[in-house]
Amino acid sequence: MTRMVQCTKLGKEAEGLDFPPLPGELGKRIYESISKEAWQQWLKQQTMLINENRLNMADPRARQYLMKQTEKFFFGEGADQASGYVPPAQG
């Protein structure tokens, strides 16, 4: 049976994640209140941030930056945007 959550990011009930995507308290929060759809949106955003900022994921500072961006994306004012990124037109 599919696990449903009230997705904080999307503001609607949607299919939940199968397991916590990150260790620790943030992973637990995401698992409990973020949908698969919103998580996929974050993965795209995260990829843009890594590429645009040329983050080296072996660097603890880069990982810390991404964890802060993850929390802001789901539970705060929104993550940083890649400079020069223009979302595709809807239609």
UniProtKB/Swiss-Prot annotation:
GO terms for cellular component: cytosol. GO terms for molecular function: iron ion binding. GO terms for biological process: cellular response to oxidative stress. Disulfide bonds: none annotated. Could be a mediator in iron transactions between iron acquisition and iron-requiring processes, such as synthesis and/or repair of Fe-S clusters in biosynthetic enzymes. InterPro entries: Fe_traffick_prot_YggX, Fe_traffick_prot_YggX_sf. Coiled coil: none annotated. It comes from Paraburkholderia phymatum (strain DSM 17167 / CIP 108236 / LMG 21445 / STM815). Gene3D superfamilies: Fe(II) trafficking protein YggX. This is Probable Fe(2+)-trafficking protein. Belongs to the Fe(2+)-trafficking protein family. Pfam families: Iron_traffic. Keywords: Iron.
